[in-house]
Amino acid sequence: MSQEQPHSPIQDARVNAVIERMQAARRRPPGGGPRGGFSSRDPHAYAEQGFSIHPEQGELIYMLCRSLRATRVAEFATSVGMSTLYFAAAMRDNGGGTVIGSEIVPAKVETARRNLDDAGLAAYAEIREGDARKTLRDLGGPVDFILIDGWPGGEGPSLARQVIEIVAPQLRVGGYVMNDNAEPDFLDFVRDPKSGFVSMTLPLKGGTELSLKVA
């Protein structure tokens, strides 16, 4: 029996063509990303590396955003815009909305905007250049979904932990947070019942945390 090709919930050929192009161009430095460690803690040192979520994660983001009828979502970090495409496609297909992304490397901001334009989704995305601890401090109202998939940061609390503490109060009850890198202090936050979340680990990309805000 032949194995069927994975079916994407996104049926826009223009969007899928950009996603496929980005997948083909994906390159990662030795160490394999945040779980494998970096030779530099400076995100600018990897300005040409497009760290991205995997398609299965992106498709789950799209489906959850559709089910929520999401209209305002956010992400840290945008990188070259892979996750942004899935969010923006969901915003468009929901009838309108905005994904607010944060990216500190200027070259990646330009690449992400170009990829969104190529996919016909630029009108549904706002990429803020700079440190997410500043750029995501005001998301303009309650958000439905947040992706935290950014640089690990230096000594002390991870950037993921710092960012979740900033954006969690802006996430509506019933909204989701997805985390790709499993930073221990981030997991401590979302798994603490006092934080107002229930959380689970999904078998995607070696372990993806999905957290639902319940209070």
Task: Show where each model-derived region lies.
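A short alpha-helical cap/connector motif
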Residues: 1-145, 153-178, 182-215
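Active-site residues of response regulator receiver
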Residues: 149
